[in-house]
């Protein structure tokens, strides 16, 4: 059963990884043709539009993911996962068409569709929570991270090549999105015929378009969870300052091409897969999630700051493994802690709340980064380190006040 969930998530994240090398060059390269001529000389306008486009997905996910999470508690994981994948497939098709037609509005609509239906990962996490005992959750959630890493090994590499006309003459910036849509369609078939229904006891949870806002309010009314939700919020803001605008940093400082970005993110994905698939599984046998998190957060903050040191692109290859492995430890263990502090019947709802918080945390950085990166290209990465460090401080304050055993 875990193997099927792993393969489903891997194919989904392969599609996500494919588009990583495309967005920044699409907006920052004046020759891409996606922006009108009068925008080409205004770097602030181009970077702000890039930031706004990136933020559309998580903002739409903020509204959609908790609805899908609640629906999965009511109707089962499988049906809602299929619905989510159909929306993702449509989103990719619209985005490819938007690039081909040089239509900004189509690009924004496509990301909104994909974001609103983008509950794939939270539903997969709920499925794993359904079949895992508390001691196995961090290890099994690490499988999601390993699938994430493997998707990011192959995805960016494939995306960089599919957008490069020097590889094949008819390749354009649209090609990776057509390919991602085809992959998602294959995933729909896989889930339909191979994904088992894991939810045994269905509950009548409330479904509303305002669930995202209610989730934020509800998160801070949960004594056992509110501090961990705050930690996750700042961790998400911090890491997304890095992931969403690191491409801009690479283009401006090291003159990276789409292919270069794809290759480097494939390298990052290799280390993420190693961190979550190997290091997390070993660490979870010897340490509790809160012990791992207390070390991985400060390690992540320090390694993000260290990214500003290299003045040669090859030097990034030394620093990035520390970023990837520390993030690989942080993600599954923070999710495991939140899951362990929740009842088995509320896993879908609580992980949906967690997804709302992460979506909000993902929506904030690109808009701010689009502005501050025009002041200095290092600022988004510096902000990434600061927010992760803040999350670590809050977590330490939380853990030091919880002497009793609350994490199973």
Task: Give the location of each predicted region.
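C-terminal ends and interior cores of transmembrane alpha-helices
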Residues: 86-101, 298-311
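Helix-to-loop junctions at the C-terminal end of transmembrane segments
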Residues: 65-76, 163, 275-289, 373
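Hydrophobic core of transmembrane alpha-helices in multi-pass small-molecule transporters
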Residues: 10, 91, 103-119, 315-329
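C-terminal transmembrane helical hairpin of 12-TM major facilitator-type secondary transporters
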Residues: 290-334
